[in-house]
Amino acid sequence: MLPVRSARNWLTLRNSWLLLRNAGRRSFYSTKPKAPRKDELPSFTKIALVGVVGTIIFAEAVKSLDKNQPKNSYSESEYAEVVKNMKRRKVMFSPGELKVQIAVQGVNPGNFHDRGRIVEPFEVAETYRKMDNDRYQPLLNDLRDTYGDQYVQNLPQGLLVMLIGRYLKDTCQKGDSVLVVDFPLDMSDAIKFENEISVVDKVLFNSPEADSDLAKYYQTVNKVEIL
């Protein structure tokens, strides 16, 4: 006689085998097996599909994140390409298209001879302030009402650079020489002008301003002329 535990295990195995055999017979002898509805896929198929779709979505999300990640390091060639693309996208005048010189505030107008067409910031601002329906006319009028003839010194940061660039584009032709006087007003304008408008060939300073931060900035690229 089998022990009780062994007998129970044997009965369990036997019953399981009989159930599987009977289930197989019912499936084999059924003449019209019930087809699953098209919208009722087997659970394992659903799981597989969810897995595939989830993987695709995740992969695309990773790609998206990868594209939007800020790049913190560049090789020398990559950096050169970035700078090249920035210049192609932003600079209004390509190098050599205009010969641009600048005379900071305080330079004697007697030094302006034979340096090309004179461009004054006040003249530039007045051109667009008096232009009907210009998008900057209301702002320039408000500033003129508030500050009078000194309103050019009180323009929003960067606006004077943009207006001068626009004025040069509207009035100059390729190969022209221009001297922008009483400019830049600060270091920010100096950097913005060369980054977005044009490379500067020379910057004129009086002797007292030779040690200014602005002069030192232009000295790093050998563009300073002391008068």
Swiss-Prot record:
Subcellular locations according to the entry: Mitochondrion membrane
Entry GO CC: mitochondrial membrane
Residue ranges of the TM segments: 41-57
Superkingdom to which the source organism belongs: Eukaryota
Tagged with keyword Cytoplasm: no
Keywords of this entry: Membrane, Mitochondrion, Transit peptide, Transmembrane, Transmembrane helix
Membrane topology listed for this record: Single-pass membrane protein
Keyword set includes DNA repair: no
Transit peptide: 1-35
Chief place where the protein resides: mitochondrion
Protein family membership: Belongs to the AIM36 family.
Protein name: Altered inheritance of mitochondria protein 36, mitochondrial
Species of provenance: Lachancea thermotolerans (strain ATCC 56472 / CBS 6340 / NRRL Y-8284) (Yeast)
